């Protein structure tokens, strides 16, 4: 589990990234600018813990709507995806909404892009292009980076499922209160304009959309 940590050579790059206008898909029970405090997530880089052992709330976002949708609505799409089904009713049951973030200034994010990983002796296929079996190792890496880089406000990488989009995971305790807001109230991912993007992704993936 610690092999990724042991492989790190030198300090990671801290990228200055403006996330103003970025997108997140999240359960409707959370506000658009709320950090997720759940200890039950089973994601590549979360949950993480603070020094006192409590769960660190985090926020995921992407710079493209397609990236945000692929990492949520399509997260369980099989590979190969051609011929698979996506049920509209299943999306509706999850009560997912889309929010657009507003943030006034750049954030300092640990660069886990291909170049950022290469800088420290890691590769994309060790950290990003991995399945859930490897999540304990990638979470341990994220925990290590969070603890060793107190100036970092989150992580930055290229989406595994939509590699034209950048993704971030932000640390709640390093973002000033009310520093991040939303441009408008959240809207359902089944609102016509957003659902059109879902159907376009379905077409790209060769899937069938069952309404």
Region roles according to the model:
Residues 1-47, 78-211:
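Active-site and NAD+-binding cores of ADP-ribose-processing enzymes
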Residues 47-80:
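Extended catalytic/binding region for NAD+/ADP-ribose chemistry, centered on the ART fold
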């Amino acid at each position: 589990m610690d092999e990724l940590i042991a492989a790190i050579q030198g300090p990671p790059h801290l990228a200055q990234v403006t996330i103003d206008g970025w997108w997140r898909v999240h359960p409707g029970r959370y506000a658009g600018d709320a950090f997720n405090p759940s200890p039950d997530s089973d994601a590549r880089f979360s949950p993480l813990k603070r020094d006192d052992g409590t769960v660190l709330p985090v926020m995921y976002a992407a710079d493209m709507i397609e990236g945000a949708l692929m990492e949520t609505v399509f997260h369980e799409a099989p590979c190969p995806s051609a011929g698979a089904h996506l049920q509209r009713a299943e999306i509706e049951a999850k009560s997912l909404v889309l929010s657009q973030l507003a943030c006034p200034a750049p954030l300092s994010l640990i660069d886990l892009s291909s170049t950022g990983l290469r800088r420290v002796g890691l590769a994309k296929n060790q950290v990003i292009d991995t399945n859930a079996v490897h999540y304990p190792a990638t979470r341990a890496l994220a925990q290590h980076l969070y603890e060793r880089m107190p100036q970092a406000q989150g992580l930055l990488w290229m989406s595994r499922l939509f590699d034209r989009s950048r993704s971030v995971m932000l640390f709640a305790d390093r973002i000033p209160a009310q520093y991040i807001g939303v441009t408008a109230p959240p809207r359902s991912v089944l609102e016509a304009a957003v659902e059109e993007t879902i159907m376009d992704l379905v077409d790209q993936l060769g899937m069938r959309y069952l309404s």
